[in-house]
Amino acid sequence: GTESGGAGLLEHCRAVQDWVDEIRRAHPDVMIENCSSGAMRADYAMLSRLDMQSTSDQADPSIYAAIAAGAGVAILPEQQGNWGYAQEEMDDETAVFTLTAGVLGRLYLSGFINRMGDRRLALVRDAVALHRRVLDEQGHLMPWWPDDLPDFNGPWLAYGLRHNHAIAEAVYPDVAALMDGNEHVEYLAVWRRGGVDSMYLQLGHGAHVRQVFPDPGQPDHAPGARPWTVEHVDPDTVRLTVADSERPSARIFEISYRAQ
């Protein structure tokens, strides 16, 4: 009898997965990405076998922000291949906006690096340095949406990585022990694509919020992207206000909680 199209597709997928398994056995140290036509085939049969997953082929930084902010719903942070494609001709805010998308996942750094001047190259280096710091901690951090799950068309997006004590205790007991008696650090990326110039976030009691990208200590790396204002409205709530309300912008913050 004639097999169904679905049965044929299933056998094809299994054959591809068997082939990937053979490659992993032969080359266990090779890192393999699942591009899958811009993440249109990001199923866990493949994600369980491959190291990284491209989250999109989207080239508009404003749209990509929503993809990067929501990817953690289905893909582990350490697998999220989020593109950051700063270009020399971009203004500072746009360059920061696109680089922010990659820092908390796996930064897919694109753009013509060889055409960049010293200032733009310094900004890219800052993003890469922060990304490497995040990578060291990703294994015991989990996705976090302090303003609920992102609205694909929403004016503000917020996505972060935070410690989960129960997971750390089960998988990284040494990390859990450090969390019990010491200050611990979490990360938050915020994009403002339009609308009002401030966002209120419930971050919990004792949250200390500090902008880390672009680095306020290196203002010459992105002089057109001035630091956002951080105000504590009450012990649990922080208000973030953009520096320029006329165009989209993004920032990454480090949030620290000191043990009580």
List PLM regions with ranges.
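Glycine-rich tight-turn/loop motif centered on a GG-T
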Residues: T2-H12
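Glycan-recognition surfaces
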Residues: L10-R115
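A glycine-rich phosphate-binding loop feature that marks nucleotide/adenosyl-phosphate handling sites
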Residues: N34-D43, G117-L121, W145-G154
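Active-site proximal loops enriched in glycine and acidic residues that flank catalytic Cys/His/Asp
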Residues: N34-S36, I113, A189-R192, L201-L203, ...
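Aromatic- and carboxylate-lined catalytic core of secreted/periplasmic carbohydrate-active enzymes
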Residues: A101-R106, S110-L149
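Carbohydrate-binding surface patches
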Residues: P150-A207, R247-E254
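Solvent-exposed beta-hairpin/edge-strand motifs
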Residues: G204-A222
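C-terminal beta-strand-rich structural cap/linker in extracellular carbohydrate-active enzymes
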Residues: A225-Q260
